[in-house]
Amino acid sequence: METGTHRARKRPGPRLGSWFRLPFLRRSHACSSEFPPPSSRQNPGNSALPERRTRYWTKLLSQLLALLPSLFQKLLLWSQLFGGLIPTRWLDFAASYSALRALRGREESAAPTVQKSLSSLRLDSSEDLVVSSLDWLEEGLQWQCSSSDLELKLKAQERALDSAAPTFLLEQQLWGVELLPSSLQAGLVSHRELDSSSSGPLSVQSLGNFKVVSYLLNPSYLDYLPQLGLRCQSSAGGGQFVGFRTLTPESCYLSEDGCHPQPLRAEMSATAWRRCPPLSTEGLPEIHHLRMKRLEFLQANKGQELPTPDQDNGYHSLEEEHNLLRMDPQHCTDNPAQAVSPAADRPEPTEKKPELVIQEVSQSPQGSSLFCELPVEKECEEDHTNATDLSDRGESLPVSTRPVCSNKLIDYILGGAPSDLEASSDSESEDWGEEPEDDGFDSDGSLSESDVEQDSEGLHLWNSFHSVDPYNPQNFTATIQTAARIAPRDPSDSGTSWSGSCGVGSCQEGPLPETPDHSSGEEDDWEPSADEAENLKLWNSFCHSEDPYNLLNFKAPFQPSGKNWKGRQDSKASSEATVAFSGHHTLLSCKAQLLESQEDNCPGCGLGEALAGERYTHIKRKKVTFLEEVTEYYISGDEDRKGPWEEFARDGCRFQKRIQETEVAIGYCLAFEHREKMFNRLRIESKDLLLYSNVKK
């Protein structure tokens, strides 16, 4: 009974152990004979049971730890795929730290006689900076993989590197750790020495059937760092090349002691400063680099001090921009560096120009698309030109040439003066003479031949707009005189009068005069008579007498309609001139005078009478007289102001008044008291009617 109870009490022990097993390790326990099942059921009274249980849990823990490298490898792969959110160096440190703790825990369980405190399992932070990260590998961590599998794995990883895929080996650092079989040899080679292996600073430590290789690049490799690789050769096989790995030092830092890998530092060493200058404080590395190159070029050529940084950030004054625009285009297009002519071609005072150029560059270098000497040299050239002009103005020495624009107006806007243009050299004047710019006027201010041709073309174009359409505002003709009554004549006389009127119209339709020059500035030489004649011709060109609807040539009788005096011919009336009025412009008076001068040949030029064909015996002009008896017509003011708007306003007022009267009359019906009263009244009446109908039935 006691033994049975004792066995019954010890049966739940294995179940508890099996409950702690992980499900993915059951198959490995069932298949492998290396780990026998727990013997608590078969040998409950064995004295070596605690030791076996300890070994069992130790091996189980080693199996669990054997899966950690692959898990960390996958984690590193995903971290690199997602932009390096988790730094790989800290993951390596965490892996080594966890493995070291696990190994020390296994040693404590395998040797229970050795007592270690819990504090010994902690990894001091001060020791991490001194102890190498390879010490935990010397404790004998057994990787559950064969040498052939490891070699295939390395080859696969190196092939993945060729396709630029992010793998575990692709870590941007100048140091690393590799686990290789003992049959392989490792060496660091550069991209220049891929054919012959060169032994680099390697640290090889044997660990059973494997070798732990920790490599650290020499500073000498930094001179040709574009490509560094790891080459593994077989000692027996003929040196089969596995592959190489590209290492970029931009995101890592090599410790100066050259012994142990160190974490990244914010500051940089002096050697790294020489190879890669820091970014500009202005935040633009390209501009800083260009400025440094420019200053080095100036220092090498001129031998002066480096100028101070540009304070205006590349902007220059308007005068310097004008100097750039006024440079000789041939020198700028051929060679910008040779924009300044040699000293032999210039006058003697220009020999000191290089020194001035250097001083200007050292004080305020300007950033432009050309070299920095160009604007300064041009400015000095202009200053020297002005100085020579001032000093040699009274002497017969040749004046230094100043680059000017071919267009005089643009050159004047850019700062040139007429005196500078007159004082230009002979070569420059010959250039102006070879290709003169036709501005439309000769030297004497008269019109040139090209301008005359253009005027003829413009006149032809203007005449094309004049049509016979009487309703065209540009073709409206009307005389500036009143119509006169003409005595009846023979058809021949009427024909002559009509031809005379047509002659006047034809003379008015003459070609447009040539417009005088208003921009030449010689207003004092103009004659007023010639100007008036030209203006009169121009005014008459717009007046076409054959168009009765032309506002500029309107004709109307100046006297009221009256009885036609027939059968009377007054010789004095024929000599009377038609009444011509002058408008608000002087041109109208000129027109009227010309028409009055033609009155003898054409006494009746009225278009309306000519078209109607009416003939009158004589022409009589009525005078305005005042009668003593005047007929007055009285019109009521109210009737005069009547209109539709007044009717509408009156109707609106009436409608508003009616609305107000209606509201006063029936507005109380809409009140609540009245409605309630009427409701009660109707309800009582409805009840009475209902009772009356029931009684009647």
Swiss-Prot record:
Composition-biased stretches (Acidic residues): 423-442, 522-531
Keywords carried by this UniProt record: Phosphoprotein, Translation regulation
Membrane-spanning intervals of the chain: none
GO cellular component terms attached to this protein's record: protein phosphatase type 1 complex
Residue ranges with Basic and acidic residues bias: 345-354
Keyword Phosphoprotein part of the UniProt annotation: yes
InterPro entries from the UniProt entry: PPP1R15, Prot_Pase1_reg-su15A/B_C, Prot_Pase1_reg-su15B_N
Free-text disruption phenotype from the record: Mice are born at the expected Mendelian ratio, but exhibit severe growth retardation and impaired erythropoiesis. None survive the first day of postnatal life. PPP1R15A-PPP1R15B double-knockout embryos do not develop past the preimplantation period.
One term of GO molecular function: protein phosphatase regulator activity
Keyword Phosphoprotein set for record: yes
List of residues that carry Phosphoserine: 197, 199, 492
GO terms, biological process: ER overload response; regulation of translational initiation; response to endoplasmic reticulum stress; response to hydrogen peroxide; response to oxidative stress
Residue span of region Disordered: 328-354, 417-456, 486-531
Domain of life, source organism: Eukaryota
Subunit details: Interacts with PP1. Part of a complex containing PPP1R15B, PP1 and NCK1/2.
PANTHER family in alphabetical order: GH11727P, PROTEIN PHOSPHATASE 1 REGULATORY SUBUNIT 15B
Assigned protein family: Belongs to the PPP1R15 family.
Chain's role: Maintains low levels of EIF2S1 phosphorylation in unstressed cells by promoting its dephosphorylation by PP1.
Stated name of the protein: Protein phosphatase 1 regulatory subunit 15B
